[in-house]
Structure formats: C-alpha cells, structure tokens
C-alpha cells in the first residue's frame, strides 16, 4: 500500500500505531453462568466483541451509527421484536458518551431524551402489555463528564423496574438520588444476578461502582 500511495503521488504512512493489543479473554458463556439466553444491539465494535465472548447473538439494526444521529426508534423496535426470541436483550447507545467527549450539553440532553422516549418507553409499554413477568434495567457503563470530556472511574446510577420490584420514594433517575439510596453494590459483577433474581427487590434507585472504563 505504501508503494502504491507513493507511486500515485499520494500521502504515505510514516508510522504504525499499534493500539489495543491483547489476547482473547476466555469468558464463561452467559447462558451457562445465568441460565439466560441474551442478545446485544449496538453499533460499537467493543460491545459486539463482548457479546461474542459471552455467547450473545448480535442484532444488526439499520440506522444504528454509534453516534448522536443513531436511529433510536429502530433500536427500540428491534429490541421489542427480539424479546420474542431471547430472555434478555441489551440495547447499547453510545450517543451520550460521544456527546460528553465533545463537551456538548445540548447533544447529551437530546440523546438522553431520545433514549427515554424512543427506547425505554416503548419497551416498557410492550413489557407491561404482555402481562408476563419482566424486569427492565437502565444503567450507564461508566462516567464520562462534560467537564473533562473523557472517561473516568466512579459510581454510576442504575434503576430497575418490573416484577417483584417495590418502588422506593424517588420519582426521578439521576446521580443524586442514586447516591442517597440505601443500597449500593461495591462489586459490579453482582448487578446481573441481582437483576435477574426471582427474589423481590425493595429499592429501585441504586449506586453501582463502575468496573472498568472503556
């Protein structure tokens, strides 16, 4: 390629930047670990790779870009359709993270509103309409602050609703309410068993320390 570029009078590469090297981790299949069949909806290669490592199917959604112009409604529709086949569907949206990297408050607010209206609300309405037991979890995977425009470590809020979940006194989902919750999870890997457990849960706004920054 270098020789072709040079022969055509085009700019040539002068350095090779090797990034993200490492060995393929050996992870236990999600179904073997939890007895649940899962699928992933995402436009981000990292999440596609994680899905493959835990044995989740990857659902491709037309219009999913991994940016703020992603088709939120399409992700919501495809997730609803996938629930007929899978026990658990993970819908990943990169837009708020990208907005924080750009330091763009308006974009971040708009992306969160789109997630709420076009993904969370339709999925919740569908789950309630079925009349079958369900649970719905909303959470970020790590903090990305507008002020720093970069990933960081720290607690992240999550909220759960559905069968066996007793609502607490909070009616808004944000960091302050999560921090005031009586329940925290020092070990992030405890979240999934907590989420899919058949036992009742009496708190819906909790604090979960991030496991890693991506």
What do these predicted ranges mean?
Residues 3-31:
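Loop-centered beta-sheet repeat module
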């Amino acid at each position: 390629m270098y020789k072709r570029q040079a022969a055509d009078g085009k700019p040539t590469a002068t350095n090779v930047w090797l990034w993200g090297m490492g060995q393929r981790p050996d992870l236990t299949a999600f179904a073997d670990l939890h007895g649940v069949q899962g699928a992933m909806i995402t436009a981000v290669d990292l999440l596609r790779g994680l899905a493959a490592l835990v044995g989740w199917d990857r659902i491709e959604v037309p219009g999913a870009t991994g940016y703020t112009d992603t088709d939120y409604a399409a992700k919501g529709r495809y997730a609803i359709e996938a629930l007929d086949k899978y026990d658990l569907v993970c819908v990943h949206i990169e837009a708020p993270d990208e907005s924080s990297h750009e330091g763009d408050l308006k974009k971040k607010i708009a992306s969160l509103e789109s997630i709420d209206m076009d993904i969370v609300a339709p999925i919740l309405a569908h789950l309630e309409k079925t009349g079958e037991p369900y649970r719905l979890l909303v959470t970020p995977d790590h903090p990305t602050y507008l002020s720093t425009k970069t990933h960081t470590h720290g607690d992240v809020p999550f909220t759960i609703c559905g069968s066996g979940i007793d609502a607490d006194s909070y009616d808004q989902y944000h960091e302050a309410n999560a921090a005031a919750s009586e329940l925290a999870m020092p070990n992030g890997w405890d979240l999934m068993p907590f989420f899919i457990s058949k036992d009742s849960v009496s708190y819906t706004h909790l604090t979960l320390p991030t496991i890693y920054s991506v």
